[in-house]
């Protein structure tokens, strides 16, 4: 399938901006938008965009959070729907401390919101349930 220039954020430079991509999607009439981000700042900006467009629901997935600071981990866990723990000590510790829905041991994935939890439950069902791992290996070191 051809995407088409009209559906690309900036066909000339092909720049990537999750926030601007979501704004473009809203401008194209989309009401339910899923977006993956890696920065705490983007989670804040996306929730601001969502608050300015009450008819739109933005589902925020955070990946590659290995080296986030404690402060950024808290921001991410305050704003995202689904977060991968990667090798992040702070995402893992704070996510566990707050009691978020969790799937997996080696690389945990947290369902932060009810929607995030539902996304994970649907995926778990599709793969036939969680499999218990004997001696699950976590990344070392956690950073």
Question: What is each residue range found by the language model?
Answer:
Residues 1-143:
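Conserved mixed alpha/beta catalytic, RNA-binding, or beta-rich assembly cores of soluble enzyme
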